């Protein structure tokens, strides 16, 4: 039986917290930023907790 491979793209983007939740950065903060307000861009810099639906998917990508 071969080893299960880690999805390298997901491994670089998401980290698991000590409590078992997943954290990652917000989307929509790489380009086309001129029309977005300063408050919105400031909030997009923060780290976010991944939703439970996506966390189940991450569990499969990152064994």
From Swiss-Prot:
Cellular component, GO annotation: cytosolic large ribosomal subunit
GO biological process: translation
Disulfide bonds: none
Entry keyword Ribosomal protein: yes
Segments of this protein annotated with the region Disordered: 1-26
Biased composition (Basic residues): 1-15
Any matching Pfam family: Ribosomal_L35p
GO molecular function: structural constituent of ribosome
Keywords assigned by UniProt, alphabetized: Ribonucleoprotein, Ribosomal protein
Recorded superkingdom: Bacteria
Recorded family membership: Belongs to the bacterial ribosomal protein bL35 family.
NCBIfam families assigned: rpmI_bact (TIGR00001)
Descriptive protein name: Large ribosomal subunit protein bL35
């Amino acid at each position: 039986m071969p080893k299960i491979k880690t999805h390298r793209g997901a491994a670089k983007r998401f980290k698991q917290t000590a409590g078992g939740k997943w954290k990652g950065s917000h989307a929509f903060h790489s380009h086309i930023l001129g029309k977005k307000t300063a408050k919105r861009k400031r909030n997009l810099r923060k780290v976010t907790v991944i939703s439970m639906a996506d966390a189940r998917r991450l569990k499969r990508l990152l064994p």
